[in-house]
Amino acid sequence: MTLTYMNIMLAFAISLLGMLTYRSHLVASLLCLEGMMMSLFIMATLIASNTHFPLINIMPIILLVFAACETAVGLALLISISNTYGLDYVHNLNLLQC
């Protein structure tokens, strides 16, 4: 395993640890989730560039689209919660149910 792959996996592990540690605030959770998605994107791009299989080249683009969608939904929830309650705590998400 090269040092590049190890650094990317370490970035994913640190983001996962941050997600588990700072799960009470929505902003910190979204930031850690974005770090996880970016490390997965870089890993998928490296794998796609090292293998010469043509169908795998679309995988990083699909992953980037999903990352953008989860960011948009997360920020919409953050704005909704902060406008309603003034706080960014994750436990306020249960109050948004119908």
Swiss-Prot record:
Gene Ontology annotations of biological process type: ATP synthesis coupled electron transport
- Enzyme Commission designation: 7.1.1.2
Q: How does it sit in the membrane?
A: Multi-pass membrane protein
Q: Where in the cell is it found?
A: Mitochondrion inner membrane
Which terms does the record give in the GO molecular function aspect?
Answer: NADH dehydrogenase (ubiquinone) activity
Its family remark reads: Belongs to the complex I subunit 4L family.
* Record-given protein name: NADH-ubiquinone oxidoreductase chain 4L
Q: State the coiled-coil residue ranges.
A: none
Q: What is its main location?
A: mitochondrion
Q: Which species is this record about? A: Macaca mulatta
Keywords (A to Z) from UniProt = Electron transport, Membrane, Mitochondrion, Mitochondrion inner membrane, NAD, Respiratory chain, Translocase, Transmembrane, Transmembrane helix, Transport, Ubiquinone
Assembly and oligomerization = Core subunit of respiratory chain NADH dehydrogenase (Complex I) which is composed of 45 different subunits.
- Any GO CC annotation of this UniProt entry: respiratory chain complex I
Function per UniProt = Core subunit of the mitochondrial membrane respiratory chain NADH dehydrogenase (Complex I) which catalyzes electron transfer from NADH through the respiratory chain, using ubiquinone as an electron acceptor. Part of the enzyme membrane arm which is embedded in the lipid bilayer and involved in proton translocation.
Which top-level enzyme class is recorded in the Swiss-Prot or TrEMBL entry? translocase
The UniProt record lists the keyword Transport: yes
Q: Which reactions fall under this protein's catalytic activity? A: a ubiquinone + NADH + 5 H(+)(in) = a ubiquinol + NAD(+) + 4 H(+)(out)
Q: Which residues cross the membrane?
A: 1-21, 27-47, 61-81
